[in-house]
Amino acid sequence: MKPVRLIRIVALALIFAFSVAAQSPSDPIREAQRLTRVAQVAQQQGRYDDAIKAYQTITVVAASSPRIAASAHLAAGNIYMMMGRFEESVTAFRKAAALDPASAEAVNNLGEALGELKQYQPALQAFQKAVALDPKYLKARYNMGVTYDRLGQMKYAEFIYRILIRDFPDFALAYDSLAVSLSKSGRAREAVPFHEKAISIAPGDPSFYFNYSLTCLMLGDVKKAQVQQQKLRALDPAMAEHLAAVIAKRQRS
């Protein structure tokens, strides 16, 4: 999910939280609603620090409404993530999860922020908790696989991706990730059909061609790698140029 879309979804969640809390109208709730609109406008205009300040003010104004305050911390955390301010996003997501312990999204996002800081074991624990809160939360389940991969636990990553493919047969990223995991484990030939399946589901994703090309190189099939590179060129010329350099280096070695 793209960061901007994620922020919009959180903003909608805030509005919903207000609608529930506003059953007992109060000045703090109305002020929080006003500040949410201020934050949304600031986000749209690219004034992210102003948006964060507005959300932080909501957490104070709506301190007596934990759900609203949690949503505000979550929104601020997502903006921090988009800005690459990962330590601050960790703090925001932790506050959101503390105020709303049932929020799988807050816990998952905490895991993503920890992952960006290369704190993979705590990140994995966060993803596992998010999945326990919501077993159907696709993003958290996928993040578990990615984190196992980063920890070098390829068998666990493979297991997660295979379960995702079983439960979500149209989830292209699971096929591609499984293919990459297999290639990294020295099983490049097994990876080929999963690369091809990922591309058949989502032919517009440049990374799928890049990864497939790398697997072809592992198999010594330079010609097929170059075919994927040419397909990639139509989608992402810069990525294709990088891949061309990788192929050329492999040919020289």
Stretch-by-stretch model annotation:
Residues S26, A32, F210-S253:
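Terminal, low-structured helical/coil segments at or just beyond the last alpha-helical repeat
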Residues V20-S71:
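N-terminal leader/linker segments that initiate helical-solenoid repeat arrays
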